[in-house]
Amino acid sequence: MTAGSSPRCTPTGPAGRAGNERGFHAVAIDARSPRFDGGIATRLDSIPFGVVVNSHGRRFYDEGEEIWPKRYAIWGRNIAQQPGQIAYSIWDAKAAGLFLPPMYGPAQASSIAGLAVTLGIGGRAVADTIAGFNASIRPGGTFDPGRLDDCATAGLTPPKSHWARPIDTPPYYGIAMRPGITFTYMGVAVTAQARVLRTDGTAFANVFAAGEIMSGNILSTGYLAGFGLTIGTVWGRIAGAEAARQARDG
């Protein structure tokens, strides 16, 4: 599991490192999830279809900045930068069914203020935030959850660039979220043949790496859905072929 420390050695000695030591793939997960090994089922995909507020009841990032496969992996970091490393996803009845249902049921209330109290945050602050959000939505947009639509806010900071609709239809739903780190963007350094490099830049003869352990060679500042599988598949094939060649030829 990822414990937050960079890989520093292999069974045969110190390994070189590659990547961004402050970078990581982190998603928004249900705050009720287990600390370790909760799995992808604890990820929350409601964010684009509502608003996200921090413990002060204020929005802090554009929930509709880009399509979800390009943005879901930044929300863990976004939440980690908020007070207490916690945030709250809020949506209304119109958004129900637009995203994968959460593993644990959301809080539910007939009013925004009531929902905020249930979630343990200030009801007045959240109600004011939602009212300001609703009032800022540009009229005339055509909502389309399958593309970057033209439903956006105007004059609001931060904006919501797409999928902005008034949150005005009860019941209202909400879930507390925390950052869930999947893997870091720092890993062991490898050659183009997937051989692990030592700290002096020379390659181990019989140590190979593929997947997240060496993702720092490729990822540094961002992530697109499927990159992890791609890195594991492509580099796994390379590493397997090279390991077989090493075993055969010595």
Where are the regions that the model predicts?
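Glycine-rich loop(s) and the adjacent beta-strand/alpha-helix scaffold that form part
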Residues: M1-D30, A194, L229, I238
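N-terminal leader/propeptide and maturation segments of large enzyme subunits in energy/redox metabolism
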Residues: Y88-D144
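Gly/Pro-rich active-site capping loops and adjacent beta-alpha segments
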Residues: R58-Q85, R198, F204-L219
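A conserved FAD-binding loop/helix module that cradles the flavin
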Residues: M1-P7, F204, M214-R248
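Hydrophobic alpha-helical segments, especially N-terminal targeting/anchoring helices
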Residues: V53-N54, V190, L197, G232
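Phosphate/diphosphate-binding loops
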Residues: R35-Y72
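A glycine-rich dinucleotide-binding beta-alpha-beta segment and adjacent secondary-structure elements
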Residues: A125-N217, T221
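Short, small/polar residue-rich loop motifs at catalytic or cofactor-binding pockets
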Residues: D45-I47, T182-T184, A225
